[in-house]
A protein has these predicted regions:
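Short, solvent-exposed loop/turn segments at secondary-structure junctions
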Residues: 22-26, 93, 117, 164-166, ...
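Conserved core of the PLP fold type I
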Residues: 43, 48-189, 193, 199-218
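Alpha-helix N-cap/helix-start motif at coil-to-helix transitions, marked by capping-box chemistry
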Residues: 32, 56-59, 63, 118, ...
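Conserved core segment of the aminotransferase class I/II
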Residues: 213-264
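N-terminal "arm"/small-domain region of PLP-dependent enzymes with the aminotransferase-like
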Residues: 1-60, 64-67
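Short, intrinsically disordered, charge-balanced linker/junction segments flanking boundaries
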Residues: 1-4, 151, 260-264
Length: 264
């Protein structure tokens, strides 16, 4: 089972205030706005919201996400993305699970930060890969150590990182380390899973360019979520991938839950 399961079960106890589960404060949930939107959806297209939909997700939402990412990241160097390269997933945890199913066989290798996110390790572990930790300091993975491991490790399928407010350390990768990582990924043509659940939670300082804005070969699989900025109970997140990867992920997504609930 998931190592996060017991942590989340504890949070249901009324006398527990948990700092372990990554739960947003309920006071921040936009309940009134969500109620208004739910009424509007029911009035305008209630039947459509309750019907089966495409496995990649509702096109209107994908277009909105693409427009927002283009507005934020094209000025930082990202190649403009299209809605057709976005898949809506049932929480970013499903994106992790689908990525593991697409990329990993037993004894394949995932390069991870040291330490790394427990939920990602749990999702990938279902495919029985090997996890190789890359020495990491307060600025991110150490490039020399990463290249050394790339050169000496067989069957590396992808690199998994959380550049913004990393879980569990909380570090934010420096711009230079992000560039170095993408230079190495490009040089050795290794896919990179950029997990960005916390990027919108910056309280001070300038936003640092994401890895997807430094990706000339479209190797980055970008994961974003509404769990920290809207409400985790909606189980609403997305992934941005190149055409080939997204086609494979679409097959897996359709075979597991058909599609993320249209009503959300």
């Amino acid at each position: 089972g998931s190592d996060l399961g017991p942590l989340l079960a504890l949070t249901a106890q009324p006398d527990i205030i948990s700092f372990a589960g990554g739960l947003p404060a309920p006071i921040t949930f936009p309940l009134k706005e969500l109620e208004e939107v739910a009424v509007k959806v029911r009035q305008e297209d209630g039947a459509g919201a309750m019907q089966y939909g495409p496995s990649l997700g509702f096109m209107g939402l994908r277009e909105t996400i693409a427009a927002r990412m283009n507005r934020m990241y094209v000025p930082m160097g990202m190649t403009e993305i299209s809605a057709k390269n976005i898949m809506i997933v049932t929480g970013s945890q499903q994106g992790l699970d689908i990525t593991g199913r697409v990329f990993l066989d037993k004894d394949d290798v995932v390069l991870i930060e040291s330490p790394s996110y427990l939920g990602a390790i749990g999702a990938f572990a279902l495919e029985q890969p090997k996890f190789v930790e890359v020495p990491t300091d307060g600025e991110g993975m150490i490039p020399e150590e990463l290249e050394k491991l790339i050169q000496t490790t067989e069957r590396v399928k992808f690199i998994y990182v959380i550049p913004n407010y990393q879980n569990p350390t909380g570090i934010c990768w420096s711009l230079e380390r992000r560039r170095k990582l993408m230079e190495l990924a490009t040089k050795y043509e290794i896919p990179v899973f950029e997990d960005n659940p916390y990027g919108d939670l910056r309280f001070e300082g300038e936003e640092i360019a994401p890895l997807i804005s430094m990706d000339p070969k479209h190797l980055v699989m970008y994961s974003g979520t509404f769990s920290k900025t809207l409400a985790p109970g909606m189980r609403l997140a997305w992934m941005v991938c190149n055409d080939d990867i997204l086609a494979k992920m679409d097959l897996v997504k359709g075979s597991t839950d058909l599609h993320t609930p249209s009503v959300t």
